[in-house]
Amino acid sequence: MLAAMAGQAYARDVVDMMGRKVTIPDDLKKVYAPSPYGAYMMYAIAPDLMSGLMFVPKDTDKKYLPKNLTDLPVIGGVGAGPNANPEMLLKTGTQLLIVWRAEPNPITEQTTALLDKTGIPYVFVSATTLEEYPAAIRYLGTLLHRENRAEKMAQMAEKILADTAAAVAKVPDAQKPKVYYAEGVDGLSTECNDSIHVQLFKLTGDVDVHRCHTSSHMGMEKISLEQVMMYKPDVIVAQESMFVQKVYTDPAWQDVKAVKDHRVYLIPRVPLNWFDRPPSFMRFLGLEWLTNKLYPNQYAVDIAKETQRFYSTFLGIDLSDADVREIVAQ
């Protein structure tokens, strides 16, 4: 997709993932991604090129992120989070914007108008599903001159997709567990099975018990405890630690099969959520984690070692065994 601009050492023409031809500086030193999708991918591929952050990382997350990130200024975003500060973009010397395109969010005229107003060249990178991520990773690797690093990530991602798919394929549909996705501190918000927020359920056998058409991109569909009980989930995967801490002692939940069987699992979320909100490259590790939880015999990997390997490859962080225990609390 990328082609150097002949005769000009200071600039090159590239074609972004929406087919737009863009002229960008060849010697990139300051790059900014004004959305969580792109910002998180920059954490992985080229944290040294980042000119700023969308928001300040939580203190609990900082030790698991590239060290230079914590000193960067907060610039804001386009379409998510606080609006980007044009003056800060200029002050930081930002040379290129990485704009992530993910379904079902279209790139609107308002968005492009905001981007054009900055006067900074921008490229669109497109990936929604995990299957689309390796191509986006390789694209960014070429764009940012990080080909070797990006290739290692893309190959790891592809291997995870292939290995987990092979494990899931060994299990007959009738033997696949029914899974309820508990969101919110009460556990009574969830996602329809067609939501982008539950792609990991699709990849592990389409196991989401809440079969419906999602009412909005934001999701968080409200549900009653009675409905959860009717679903008879074998497993509950939860976002909130407060819910997991109380579910085994809350009388109202004691008749739910997953609770009876002690199969309620808290999704790891340090430094980025492994599952959702926002969906990021961390979902590859989340896919391994979930496949191992649902099919421990078919996907009998050592999640602690996989976690160390993944954080090393994608975040450049070497985790101790104690770090892994802290991250993978369940």
Regions found by a protein language model. Name each.
Residues 5-11:
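Sec/Tat signal peptide C-region and signal peptidase I cleavage site
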Residues 11-14, 21, 110-189, 218, ...:
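Extracytoplasmic substrate-binding proteins
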Residues 17-19, 75-87, 214-225:
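Short helix-initiation/N-cap motifs at beta->coil->alpha
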Residues 22-24, 39-44, 59-63, 99, ...:
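Short, solvent-exposed loop/turn elements at domain surfaces
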Residues 32-34, 51-54, 96-100, 122-125, ...:
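Structural recognition of the beta-strand scaffold that forms the well-ordered cores
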Residues 38-92, 96-105, 206-209:
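A short, structured surface patch at a secondary-structure boundary
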Residues 79, 193-219:
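Alpha-helical, coiled-coil/dimerization segments enriched in small aliphatic residues
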Residues 103-117, 239-254:
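A ligand-binding cleft/hinge motif common to bilobed small-molecule-binding domains
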